[in-house]
């Protein structure tokens, strides 16, 4: 059992080294996008499925509440939280439309839309990001594996190049925390 624990921690460390080596400039670019958008009255919309839905909620909570600094709240919405909206859209239009319909209703030009997908192929995230681009939003993918089809359609992809979903999720939440830290320091530091 101890060997398995050490192997998992080694795997985690390898992913973090990859994130540090490959994604630092892109993380900075995303922080810049968010500083610009939120500093100019725009909002953040975040979505994902399963564990990525939880990450979307976590991201929005850090933006609306706070990460480390006492500051005013900033506008962010996790498109994963309203069960009435999700089930109404899912029932009437299908699961692939649950985020797209919300983008149609809530997104404005200049907003930032983040799609989180450990596979990079979530159809409901993909469709919503396409619409967000048409609306004039900046689009970001927090992705895994090779980035899948979503990597090709976003303005900035933060792809954690790993096939192990738990390690990808660990990379995603670390990236989210770094972005929140940079954002607060730039806007309020």
Swiss-Prot record:
Transmembrane spans: none
Free-text remark on how the cofactor is bound: Binds 1 zinc ion per subunit.
Domain of life: Bacteria
Catalytic activity annotation: 2 D-sedoheptulose 7-phosphate = D-glycero-alpha-D-manno-heptose 7-phosphate + D-glycero-beta-D-manno-heptose 7-phosphate
Keywords: Carbohydrate metabolism, Cytoplasm, Isomerase, Metal-binding, Zinc
Cofactor(s) annotated in UniProt: Zn(2+)
Primary residence: cytoplasm
Pathway: Carbohydrate biosynthesis; D-glycero-D-manno-heptose 7-phosphate biosynthesis; D-glycero-alpha-D-manno-heptose 7-phosphate and D-glycero-beta-D-manno-heptose 7-phosphate from sedoheptulose 7-phosphate: step 1/1
UniProt-listed PROSITE patterns: SIS
Any Pfam family: SIS_2
The protein's Enzyme Commission number: 5.3.1.28
Segments forming domain SIS: 34-189
GO CC terms: cytoplasm
Binding of substrate, residues: 49-51, 62, 91-92, 117-119, 122, 169
Sequence positions that bind Zn(2+): 58, 62, 169, 177
GO molecular function: carbohydrate derivative binding; D-sedoheptulose 7-phosphate isomerase activity; zinc ion binding
Gene Ontology BP annotations: carbohydrate metabolic process; D-glycero-D-manno-heptose 7-phosphate biosynthetic process
Subcellular location: Cytoplasm
Job of this protein: Catalyzes the isomerization of sedoheptulose 7-phosphate in D-glycero-D-manno-heptose 7-phosphate.
Self-association and partners: Homotetramer.
Family statement drawn from the similarity comment of this UniProt entry: Belongs to the SIS family. GmhA subfamily.
Miscellaneous comment as given in the Swiss-Prot or TrEMBL entry: The reaction produces a racemic mixture of D-glycero-alpha-D-manno-heptose 7-phosphate and D-glycero-beta-D-manno-heptose 7-phosphate.
Protein name from the UniProt record: Phosphoheptose isomerase
Organism name: Geotalea uraniireducens (strain Rf4) (Geobacter uraniireducens)
